[in-house]
Amino acid sequence: MATREWFVMNAQQTKLALESPPLFAVKKDDDKDHTCDTGEEPYALVGSPVFNPLEDYKREVVSIIDEYFSSGDVEVAASDLMDLGLSEYHPYFVKRLVSMAMDRGNKEKEKASVLLSRLYALVVSPDQIRVGFIRLLESVGDLALDIPDAVNVLALFIARAIVDEILPPVFLARAKKTLPHSSQGFQVILVSENSYLSAPHHAELVETKWGGSTHITVEETKRKISEFLNEYVENGDTREACRCIRELGVSFFHHEIVKSGLVLVMESRTSEPLILKLLKEATEEGLISSSQMAKGFSRVADSLDDLSLDIPSAKTLFESIVPKAIIGGWLDEDSFKERSDQNGGSENLRRFKKDAETIIQEYFLSDDIPELIRSLEDLGLPEYNPVFLKKLITLAMDRKNKEKEMASVFLASLHMEMFSTEDFINGFIMLLESAEDTALDILAASDELALFLARAVIDDVLAPLNLEEISNSLPPKSTGSETIRSARSLISARHAGERLLRSWGGGTGWAVEDAKDKIWKLLEEYEVGGVISEACRCIRDLGMPFFNHEVVKKALVMAMEKKNDRMLNLLQECFAEGIITTNQMTKGFGRVKDSLDDLSLDIPNAEEKFNSYVAHAEENGWLHRDFGCSTDS
């Protein structure tokens, strides 16, 4: 067989051999008189239970996987695996998870793939994922004895891992070189390569092969809630209704049961006693938490205006139910009031949310940042800036990559122009606190939010330390905390800056140096007599608005070197057309300021020229007036 050095962690095997304790313990027999030579052995070998970390790990892992297949709770599975410690054995976990899923239904296969993607880099390292799959390839012959289609199923798991980007595509080529051509493992690679990864639209086909998402859809959940509530109103069986709530298995969505129940009461007054009884019992049994109850009531409060169109007495009925719930002890008054305030309890906030949504939708159509900033300023409610940020990102997450990129670009434009760092922090906290709810409508919400957070750090909208501040505001094992960890992982990855700038197609795929070279060339062409409108078009065509600070920096340096202030005319036109924002201007001027010592070696009057450019920029509104003060200091 060909060498397996790439696959087998020899150091790990050696460590296992060294750390494995003896099978027997040596016990000294102190009861014997050793002054006499009796010819008896003074020591006896006795059987002793011995701690074997790998065996214990294997047992625990099977339990974790079984529980995960039953509950589908990724967070619990990840937490349990981390609590085990013994991370050096995680390749075994990968092998065991996949092999157990291979012998089960499509639901478990999908769950296994989802879990691997969520654990990737955070709990299980990329190398451990790779080694786990190699061990599967090496043992597929044994698996085929119990699972007739093992070759095909494992091929699909590998294809899915490549589509999910937890295995690199080069994995296939490397595996081919190390596996015997006659082995079933080699056949797995061929099937994965030829049957799954070479087909048109293969990513979509592979992702949906086992039925796609393991999560019940929002529409289906709402339908089931409506069905069992209607049945309950007909038969009055509270115990059966509680059983239905349990079987739904969506504790984070119980507020929808509360909301649907209250709406049902408004539509049919005769159902009120039964619905209130059910909500009371569900609370007392711990089925519906106090926070979910408060959330359900606040959702109804938020939609009273719409409900009143079909049910004129909706507001009156709701106001009569709230005191009953509070007096009955199953609605916490403080939680309800607090949540109502957060979710738009005031008329001003409701109106702001509606107006914000309108101007964001217009921005997605026009891509006009200056107009959006003017519209936001016209609203005149800076205290709701975090709410605007939450609305912007939530709407973008439910759209295509183009809108996601536009949202990130706009956040960078808002930075230092309108929004404070505190606004950004509070906005992201609001997003992360509601991540579970958002995930019901946008299944990849957690991953998308992690990208938005990481991108905000790369764009200097947030500092890396701000992630710690945001994390401290969230429950330790919440979805929001997991999203923060994912964002940190994205930021720490190799070439993170370039990859994140192109995560939604924002960049053109060039290297940064290539982009800088193109900027320098277009400025040179303009400097020797180019047309200003053509130069502006070229800057637009770069398609990197978040990198326009480099245009500012190079234009200022060229103006100093060539002793030609014509560059200032170009910057003025770019600013007037909204191509370069105040934020990008500030960043560009700041970069030049930071490099003045080096520039002065070649341009003796660099500082004098720079100060005159700052004065010109402040006079024309490119920079805030306090920029010059910071320069003087």
Swiss-Prot record:
Any single Gene Ontology cellular-component annotation: cytosol
Expressed in which tissues: Mostly expressed, at low levels, in rosette leaves and flower buds, and, to a lower extent, in roots, stems, cauline leaves and flowers.
Localization in the cell: Nucleus; Cytoplasm, Cytosol
Chief location bin: nucleus
SUPFAM superfamilies xrefs: ARM repeat
Classification via InterPro entries: ARM-type_fold (IPR016024), Initiation_fac_eIF4g_MI (IPR003891), PDCD4 (IPR039778)
Residues annotated as domain MI: 56-177, 220-341, 351-472, 514-633
Motif Nuclear localization signal 1 per UniProt: ranges: 94-101
GO molecular function, one term: ribosome binding
Disruption phenotype: Increased susceptibility to dark and starvation, and to treatment with the TOR inhibitor. Decreased translation activity associated with altered ribosome patterns, especially in the dark and starvation conditions, in which mRNAs distribution is altered and rRNA abnormally degraded. Slightly early flowering time under long-day conditions.
Keywords, ordered alphabetically: Cytoplasm, Nucleus, Repeat, Translation regulation
Motif annotated as Nuclear localization signal 2, chain positions: 389-396
Domain of life per record: Eukaryota
Induction field: Induced by dark and starvation but repressed by glucose feeding subsequent to starvation in a TOR-dependent manner.
Nuclease listed as a keyword: no
GO biological process: negative regulation of DNA-templated transcription; regulation of translation; response to absence of light; response to carbon starvation
Keyword Methyltransferase recorded: no
Reported function: Involved in target of rapamycin (TOR)-regulated translation control, especially under energy-deficient conditions.
Family: Belongs to the PDCD4 family.
Oligomeric form and interacting partners: Binds to EIF4A1. The association with ribosomes is modulated by cellular energy status and TOR activity.
Protein name per UniProt: MA3 DOMAIN-CONTAINING TRANSLATION REGULATORY FACTOR 4
Recorded name of the encoding gene: MRF4
